[in-house]
């Protein structure tokens, strides 16, 4: 948008706005964050198991790490199944 367009109050055409949005979506998907599971989640899950194992006896399959998108946020969800003795 040029300075003259800005001062005169010209609005962008719908097609150009849609094109810009599509370019942003494509760039996001190409960066590896659109829909695929990030590489660090596996390492994060292993480290969580190691830290929690210091205090509670758990197995690696007792912890689940999931990343999901909600609106403009990325939510990291960690589910942990504690053994009966630890629930106390």
Swiss-Prot record:
Gene3D superfamilies: Cell division topological specificity factor MinE. Keywords: Cell cycle, Cell division. SUPFAM superfamilies: Cell division protein MinE topological specificity domain. The keyword Cell division applies. InterPro entries: MinE (IPR005527), MinE_sf (IPR036707). One of its GO terms (biological process) is cell division. Belongs to the MinE family. Prevents the cell division inhibition by proteins MinC and MinD at internal division sites while permitting inhibition at polar sites. This ensures cell division at the proper site by restricting the formation of a division septum at the midpoint of the long axis of the cell. This is Cell division topological specificity factor. It comes from Methylibium petroleiphilum (strain ATCC BAA-1232 / LMG 22953 / PM1). The lineage of its organism: Bacteria, Pseudomonadati, Pseudomonadota, Betaproteobacteria, Burkholderiales.
